[in-house]
């Protein structure tokens, strides 16, 4: 179906403040879920599909920012949007994995199966 984007990898539900910026755009928002390949964000400044953004994610309980140099906006619905990360540097991928692991340990486990 047109309008649907398949997710690559499991996403971790989270609530992390973030800043994003791109050509002519600078905003703040909340990361609602995070995976190695992308994220779902609620932002205060509109973006467009195809736009390239840089992200600064403030990880709860971690003094070090998670910096994503290149993320492509894949969908937009009002103030909500999805981005896919362009992970070219292994250190960025390692840092995202580290953050996801840390956040997963702090979240309560679901009693649901599957």
Feature-to-residue mapping (PLM):
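N-terminal helix initiation/capping motif
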Residues: 1-34, 101-114
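Short coil/turn motifs at beta-sheet boundaries
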Residues: 11, 48-50, 64, 76
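Short beta-strand-centered aromatic/proline hotspots
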Residues: 29-31, 67-74
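Short structured motifs
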Residues: 2, 38-41, 68-69
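Short strand-loop-strand
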Residues: 14-46, 52-54, 80-82
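C-terminal output/interaction extensions
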Residues: 80-114
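A residue-level detector for short acidic-glycine micro-motifs
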Residues: 33, 73-77, 87
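Short, charged beta-turn/beta-strand-edge "cap" motif at the junction between a beta-strand
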Residues: 58-63
């Amino acid at each position: 179906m047109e309008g649907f984007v398949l997710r690559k990898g499991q996403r971790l539900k989270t609530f992390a403040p973030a800043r994003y910026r791109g050509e002519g755009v600078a905003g703040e928002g909340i990361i609602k879920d995070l995976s190695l390949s992308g994220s779902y964000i609620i932002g205060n400044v509109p973006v467009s599909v195809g736009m390239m953004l840089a992200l600064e994610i403030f990880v709860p309980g971690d003094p070090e920012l998670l910096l994503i140099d290149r993320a492509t906006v894949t969908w937009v619905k009002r103030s909500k949007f999805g981005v896919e990360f362009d992970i070219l540097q292994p250190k960025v991928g390692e840092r995202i994995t580290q953050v996801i692991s840390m956040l997963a340990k702090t979240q309560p486990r679901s009693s649901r199966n599957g």
